[in-house]
């Protein structure tokens, strides 16, 4: 289409990879489980069952209620697994290794596919377009949940608290509509900013090597700073990133469940 670029970017490639890993892993584990004569979870399936129960009991059930828990748990599970895998793959230096191989062995041209792959970050959830797409799913899930629970028209009526004078409707309605848009915007910014911040911090710390190299005009000083300061700090932040991966996936999933639950349980 004229004016629209549909080329496959690095983040699109990573999204396909993440989707394939999540779908393939869950499908393989489920089929292996169902092929047993006595379906008893063991090994990897124990972890899958624990994750399903944890999301269902700690996130879905308290927010959407027992009536809708089966309907909405799959969405929350998909969000959590997708975000965890996307965040985790971003920590693996796949394209950095490709860059080193290219530098040492391949020596590809400036406009080659390899050069295009090694430019930019590899964490799909650090791209605001990706997190905006996830938040858009949450936005429509809220509308669908409220419409299924109360009817389409009543769902929109529920935006205004009951018992409020109609005289202040012109003030409340725009505020509530803005609130509907702020929720997915907040989800978008929170996830992308948190996943971007850690990588920026690591790059900033590793840049000390080059800064001290230029400052003292000595490669030995740069390497020394890297060994004594930059590398240990970068490793520490990378370890912290592992925690952030789980926390951000949990927070995004929890907030989605809270927003969906608010549309269903209006009295809350």
Provide a role label for each language-model segment:
Residues 1-268:
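Selective transmembrane helix interface/packing segments
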